[in-house]
Amino acid sequence: WAAVQAVWDHFESYRPQIAEKERRVYGKEPEWVAPQPFTVTTTDGTSVQLRGGYYPIKYDPAASQRAEEHADAESAKRQLQGAYTTATTRRSFTKARAEEVSGRPLLYTLGGLYSGVNDVIHDLAWHEWLIDANRLLRSHTIDQAIREHYGPEAKQQFKTWAADIAEGE
């Protein structure tokens, strides 16, 4: 149980950096999920008090059609993002939690841990840079200069580069 609490504490250690970045970008902190303390009784009868914490839930796309459809929709959304909107990082860890989710079985692997930590670090490293890069790429003056001096292929490469960074590739 110490390992479980250590994982929650690790996610909690990012909170100050996430809060600071979200205040800079959006003017406010995310609606944090409040930890729910609880007690577990081990097989030897010992009671262990845990503080609780955040863990990124992942749904098993192979376990139900609804979960598979949601995974497909998320993938399509990410692929279209660079074409119709500005490229950005994944930030599910800043979103409010749903009260109830049905028909989407959980994925019982450590994938949530690995992808969750990766998403947080990637967002902290690149989100603000992507905002600035996308602002530059949308500038008509810069667009015209790139196209005139280097051609439309160069402009497309910059857009692809930003989209790849946003995706984490």
Predicted regions and their residues:
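Structural preference for well-ordered, secondary-structure-rich domains
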Residues: 1-169
